């Protein structure tokens, strides 16, 4: 599964059981990235993705998603050692927000692609693609191509 998260400059994810921020350009980019594949979300995230038709709503999207499917994670931290995770897609707000939930990306994950674009309510959004490394090699051969995440 591909995990999609939005983080601030301190890797903050959420504060007081709420998302730190939102940006409709990020939501549009997520929709383009996912394409026709399933996007698993919680009911909390539903209002962000009203225009997306291939949504799957679950209280535990990470438990339901299969290989090659996407999970948008908003309110809870992640176990980055989870072998089910094929790739991380991180949207950075390029700001610091209050946070009581954060994510630490382990050393086994390698930043493979970066893209910057203007958001609607954020001057700059940074999209980062992380792939798992195995013995110093990229085990999934993932890359960003034309706004889509692909595996070779």
Task: Show which residues each predicted segment covers.
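Enzymes that bind and transform nitrogen-containing heteroaromatic metabolites
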Residues: 1-152
């Amino acid at each position: 599964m591909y995990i999609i998260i939005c983080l601030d400059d301190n890797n903050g994810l959420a504060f007081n059981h709420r998302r730190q921020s939102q940006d409709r350009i990020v939501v549009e980019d997520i929709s383009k990235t996912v394409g026709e594949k399933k996007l698993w979300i919680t009911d909390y995230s539903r209002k962000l993705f009203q225009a997306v038709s291939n949504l799957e709503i679950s209280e535990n999207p990470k438990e339901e998603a299969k290989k090659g499917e996407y999970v948008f994670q908003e309110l809870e931290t992640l176990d980055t050692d989870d072998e089910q995770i094929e790739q991380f897609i991180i949207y950075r707000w390029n700001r610091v927000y209050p946070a009581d939930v954060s994510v630490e990306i382990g050393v086994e994950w390698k930043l493979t692609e970066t893209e910057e674009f203007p958001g609607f309510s954020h001057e700059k959004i940074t999209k980062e693609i992380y792939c798992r490394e195995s013995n110093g090699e990229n085990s999934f051969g993932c890359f960003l191509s034309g706004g889509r995440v692909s595996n070779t």
